[in-house]
Amino acid sequence: MYKRQEKEFRFPLAYGNQRPPSASWTVTGSGACVLGKTRSRVKITGATTGKIIDYGLKDNQNMGACMAPAACDTIAQNLVDFNREPANYDRIVTGDLGVVGREILLELLKKKGYDISEQHSDCGMLIFDPAKQDTGAGGSGCGCAASVLAEYLLPKLENGEWKRILFVPTGALMSKVSFQEGSSRAVSYTHLTL
């Protein structure tokens, strides 16, 4: 699966290209959660739907920069919708912005008057150990956010270490054909408040 994803949306592994530091690695993980009526410590208390934001970026090796504006827009909208400050969350967790996208996100939110640097984590940065693994900007793909949510974030809510998180899985709408024709990569995602 990993090789297929790399071939479809980046470069075939056999091509041997050099990855730029902004590139991320496709996570071939998964996660599943079941919603039910039974009361538990973990619950969804609200949601803010994200929207497509297209800054016209065309670098398929820098997905974090492509997705950061959409993450910024939804986080800011959530804070307005629920009349909250970043400090009202134990963690604000994005899906797969990685190192580069995180820096852009923090800068964009500061321009809107929000500093989330203390609360922010990114699944793409949490899933790999950069000291032991050469993973560039971090992990990417829907498996990244899903596996970190299921195996790392939800247990912290369940055991009471955290009371409230803002989970913002990020994603890029990609077409290898339109990208090769010179179109930009648009971004869309949604999130859940837990």
Language-model features: locations:
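Conserved small/polar residues in nucleotide/adenosyl-binding loops
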Residues: M1-Y2, T190-L194
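Active-site-proximal alpha-helical scaffold in enzymes
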Residues: K3, K7, W25, A32-T38, ...
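Short, well-ordered beta-to-alpha junction loops that form the rim of enzyme active sites
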Residues: K3, T94-L97, P169-A172
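Active-site-adjacent elements of ketosynthase-type condensing enzymes
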Residues: R4-Y15, G101-R102, V148, S175
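Condensing-enzyme catalytic core mediating Claisen C-C bond formation in acyl metabolism
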Residues: F11-A76, D81-R84, Y114, E118-L126, ...
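Long, repeat-rich segments with strong aromatic
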Residues: L79-P86, R91-L105
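Short glycine/threonine-rich loop-to-helix capping motif typified by GTGT followed
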Residues: L97-K112, V177-S184
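Internal helix-turn-beta structural module
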Residues: L153-E181
